[in-house]
Regions:
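Short loop/turn motifs at secondary-structure junctions
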Residues: 96, 128-130, 151
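Conserved active-site alpha-helix within GNAT-family acetyltransferase domains
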Residues: 113, 138-156
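Conserved GNAT acetyl-CoA-binding A-motif
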Residues: 125-135
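Acetyl-CoA-dependent GNAT
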Residues: 2-107, 116-118, 122-126, 156-160
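Glycine-rich phosphate-binding loop
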Residues: 110
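Conserved beta-strand-loop-alpha-helix junction that forms the acyl-donor binding cleft
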Residues: 133-144, 160-163, 168
Length: 168
């Protein structure tokens, strides 16, 4: 089974944590809501652009699964970010990964760490035998600190100019 099928086989409660949930992007309304997300210019270089992530999902949908990140605000779900879980293509070894961001209004609240923990849980539940590798821009020290705190180790491998962190 591919990543999409494995994720689809998981129970709905696997996609929720204490404060957030991942909602699969399936409709035009979801695409519109995703299109409203933006980061300030100084943060844009640290993450894949949304068009690139959606392009990956279009080219290989079975291995690239996009989600909105939602949090309840005033009893209604608010879109606070985006995450795409994917199986890395074109690498020597099979690996799982993600691209994600939280919009500025919700940064600094621990929601990025919560999203990363939820992503780890989902990927481990879907494909426990496949390691998780994350590519990180050299100057994205916030992501590097977060991934180290979550148990990732810096690898000697590089993804172009990016550092690669591996969860053993």
């Amino acid at each position: 089974m591919n990543l999409m099928e494995k994720l689809d086989a998981l129970p709905a409660d696997c996609f929720r944590s204490r404060r957030i949930c991942f909602q699969r992007i399936r409709t035009e309304e979801d695409l519109f809501r995703m299109g409203l997300l933006s980061l300030p210019p100084e943060q844009q270089a640290a993450v894949n652009p949304l068009w690139f992530s959606l392009g990956r999902a279009y080219i290989a949908p079975e291995q690239n699964v996009p989600f909105l990140i939602l949090q309840r605000v005033d009893e209604r779900p608010a879109v606070i970010g985006f995450i795409q879980l994917h199986k890395r293509l074109g690498t020597e070894r099979e690996a799982l990964s993600w691209s994600f961001f939280i919009i500025p209004a919700f940064q600094g609240m621990g929601l990025g760490a919560e999203a990363a923990k939820l992503a780890i849980s989902l990927l481990r539940s879907a494909m426990p035998e496949v390691p998780i590798h994350l590519s990180v821009e050299r100057d994205n020290s916030a992501a590097q600190r977060l991934y180290a705190k979550l148990g990732f180790c810096l690898s000697r491998e590089r993804d172009g100019d990016d550092l690669v962190y591996v969860l053993p």
